[in-house]
Amino acid sequence: MEKVDIKNFTLQELEAYIAGQGKERFRAKQIFKWLYQQDAREFADMTNLSKDFRQELEKTAWISNLDAEAVEASADGTKKYLFRLADGNAVESVLIPDEDRTTLCISSQVGCAMGCEFCLTGTFKLTRNLTTAEIVNQVCAVKRQEPVRNIVFMGMGEPLANLKNVVGALKILTDPDGFQFSTRKVTVSTSGLVPEMAELGASVTVNLAVSLNATTDEVRDRIMPINRRYPLKELLAACKAFPLPSRRWITIEYVMIRGVNDSLDDAKRLVRLISNIPSKVNLIPFNEHDGCTFQAPTQDSIDKFHKFLLDKHVTVITRSSRGSDISAACGQLKGRLDKAVKD
């Protein structure tokens, strides 16, 4: 019988597994705390479980782990981690320091199938989904080295295209017996998979970020093929329907591209589009990269766009580019570090 990777289980699933072994369900909480609060890497580390029970677990289950194969540091303090998976594929995570908090950007897929024109990861194509264990092990590995305050699913892949495993990881991240992250500290970003947005909202409580990036279907169809399946009207309706706890907002991510979506007319349309959605806007100046003809917006167009939103009482920040010198900035993850390691 093939052993199960115990890190693929949520607490509820682990309780069922332990009960199936003829043991008390509360043992699952003990194991969970060892895995995610004590970073136990072997059952032998779990000293409040009997030796016999630990030996029984080893017969049917195992504990997966990831260690960074390479770490690249940016001049601004950002760090990019390369993780080699058991099948030889690789994913990247990015740790972004910011005064009193650090944010870890994690991957949910090897590659991505969304094909967004401005995103380097999209040229990598989709190889496969990550398992729940492979997602949470990115967090385990980085937390061994650095404190992590916030988690964002904004690395490689479309999280909602791997909904089951992402939801499993979210439950582990926010479980009081797991990583203990506040749901306010965990954000899932999507390019706009409308049915899965509803499923996510019904499954877990987390922050939602929506990669909007255009104010007309014509432009969004061109730069984000997913819009042909779920156009703006459907996407914005899904945003409005997404269940939010009090005093929470959906983050509208808007990658500004010169001559494509950075005009004042775009700013005016954006205000109208999100007027009835509890939201805040993140303006993200496009990060130029090889193989893409798009250009970064001018500072003048960024400033005017930002000011227009502020004047219309929209909560807005312009995100500074972090880690661009190590290809760790928004839209730049594509395994450059993996290639460097192999070479």
UniProtKB/Swiss-Prot annotation:
Its cofactor is [4Fe-4S] cluster. This is Dual-specificity RNA methyltransferase RlmN. Belongs to the radical SAM superfamily. RlmN family. GO terms for biological process: rRNA base methylation; tRNA methylation. Specifically methylates position 2 of adenine 2503 in 23S rRNA and position 2 of adenine 37 in tRNAs. m2A2503 modification seems to play a crucial role in the proofreading step occurring at the peptidyl transferase center and thus would serve to optimize ribosomal fidelity. It comes from the Bacteria. Binds 1 [4Fe-4S] cluster. The cluster is coordinated with 3 cysteines and an exchangeable S-adenosyl-L-methionine. Residues 98-325 form the Radical SAM core domain. Its EC number is 2.1.1.192. Keywords: 4Fe-4S, Cytoplasm, Disulfide bond, Iron, Iron-sulfur, Metal-binding, Methyltransferase, rRNA processing, S-adenosyl-L-methionine, Transferase, tRNA processing. It comes from Geotalea uraniireducens (strain Rf4). It is an enzyme of class 2 (transferase). Its main location: cytoplasm. GO terms for cellular component: cytoplasm. HAMAP family: RNA_methyltr_RlmN. NCBIfam families: rRNA_mod_RlmN. It holds the Pfam family Radical_SAM. The lineage of its organism: Bacteria, Pseudomonadati, Thermodesulfobacteriota, Desulfuromonadia, Geobacterales.
